[in-house]
Amino acid sequence: MYENSCSYQTALDLKRVSPPTLAQVKTEECLALGQCSPEWTSYRFHQSTFEQLKQSVEKAKAALQDRSSFFGASSAFSDIYSSQRLTDSLDTLPVQSGNGGGNCLGLPHNPNVGVGVAGVLNYNAVSSSTAGVLSSSGNGVQRHRLDTLQPPSGCSPAVTQHGVITSSAGQVTSGTLDAVSAAPALPSLTASSSSHVEHKVRADKSTLDCATTSSHAAAPSSSSSASDHQQGRISGSKSSNTSGTGGGASASGGGGSALYSSYKSSWGSHSSTQSQGYSSNALGIKHDPHSQLRQPDPYQMFGPTSSRLASSGSGQIQLWQFLLELLSDSNNASCITWEGTNGEFKLTDPDEVARRWGERKSKPNMNYDKLSRALRYYYDKNIMTKVHGKRYAYKFDFQGLAAATQPAASDPTYKYQSDLFMTPYHHSAKLSSFMSPHHGMTSSSASIFPSAASWGNWGSPATNLYQPHSMSHVTPSHVAPHLSSYPHYA
C-alpha cells in the first residue's frame, strides 16, 4: 500500500545522507489519485506527514538505543513495529514481571494488532500506555481519546513521578480532520502549514517541555524547534482540543499548552520550594546554637556581675555602683545602655540619669554637669574612662574595679571565681563570652580579674581558667558538675 505513494527506503536513505528538515522530507511527487488504493484515499492528505512519521520512527529507534525517553507512532505503522531491528531493540529492555509477553514499555509483540504508544518521561524509565490512535471509519478519520497515562507497575523507580501526565487528552472531531483533508495542494502540506499539523506540533511541544523539565535524561533531539516538529509526530500524549473547523484547531492548541505549562510550573515550584525548605531548615539548625555567640547580649553578660558589684561594700552607694545598678536592668535603656560587650556604656538621657542619682542621694538640684565632674574622679582610680570621640560615652575598667573592691572581700579568689563563673546563665553564650579569647577578652574578660600576683598561687591564670573550658566540647566531664543547669551541654 505504501509503495504506491512513496518509498520508505528512499526516505531512510535521505535521512542517512543529511539531517532531515521540513523542506527535505518531500522525496517524490504525489502520484495521481487514481493510482492510490481505496484504503489510501482517506490518508492521501497525509503523504508528507507520513514521510515525516517514517523518519521520526527511525529517529525514535536510534533515540531508544541512546536511552531516550520518547517513543511512539500511529497505528497506521503497526507493521513497522514487527521489523527485526525494532523487535531486537525492544527485547533488550527489562521484562516486566507478571506481564506475560510485554516488556517495560508495555508493548505487546503482536504484529497483527495496531497500537499507538504514549510514552511519558519518568526519570530514567519510560512508562507507556497503549491505545488506539487512528482508525478508519467510512467517510473520514477520527482521532480517539487517549486514556489517562499510568506507568506500568514494576518499571518506574520508587521516586516521585514528575513526568507522568494524568490529564486525559481531548478529542479532535472528524470535522477537523476533514477540513484539513480538503487541502488539495501538496506544498502546503510539505511546509506543515495546515492547522492539523500546527496543532499537533503545538500540543506535542508542550508535552515535550513538561517532560524535559522533569528530568535531565531527555532526548537531545527534543531541545530544538526542528526536532520538536519531528518528535511531535511520534509522541503519544497530546493536549488536543475539540474544534469544528481546521482554523479553530490551531487556535485552540494554546489551551492545552497552558494546561501542561501550569502542570509543569506547579511541579517545578513544588520541587524548588521543597529543596529550599530543606536547605533553610538545615542552615537554621546549624546556625541557631551559635547565633548568640556572635552577638552576645551585654545585659545578660554583665547583668549578674553588675548587680553584685553594685550591692558590694558597706555604707552609702557610690556613683559607679549606681550606674552599674542601672545597667543591670535593660528597662533602663532609655536613659543608659551598654554599647557592645567591652564594658562601654552610654548615657542616652544624661539628665534623667542625673535626676535619678539626685533622688538616690537626696540632692534634688543634681544635674549632668555635677555628675560628669564626679565621674572624672574615677578616671584616676582606673574604675572607668571616657570614650574619646563619643558624647556621653564611658567605659568601665573591670580590673581597676575589682582592685578597688578587693579589700572589702574576705576571700577574693573564691569570691570572683564563684561570682563570675558559677552564676546560672541561661545559655552557654554568656558563659563562653567570659572564657573564650575570641570575644573581646583583652578589653572586658581579662580585665575583670585582678593582676596575677593578687591571685596567690595562680601562676598562670589564663592557662588554668581557659584550658578546661576550651576542652569542654570534647570532654564535657571537666565541667559537667558545674553546668548541670545549662541546656546546651545537657
Swiss-Prot record:
It is found in: Nucleus. Residues 196-207 have a biased composition (Basic and acidic residues). One of its GO terms (biological process) is regulation of DNA-templated transcription. Residues 317-397 bind DNA. PROSITE patterns: ETS_DOMAIN_1 (PS00345), ETS_DOMAIN_2 (PS00346), ETS_DOMAIN_3 (PS50061). Residues 211-227, 271-280 have a biased composition (Low complexity). SMART domains: ETS. It comes from Drosophila melanogaster (Fruit fly). It holds the Pfam family Ets. Gene3D superfamilies: Winged helix-like DNA-binding domain superfamily/Winged helix DNA-binding domain. Belongs to the ETS family. This is DNA-binding protein D-ETS-3. GO terms for molecular function: DNA-binding transcription factor activity, RNA polymerase II-specific; sequence-specific DNA binding. Residues 190-255, 271-294 are annotated as: Disordered. Embryonic ventral nervous system, higher in the thoracic than abdominal segments.
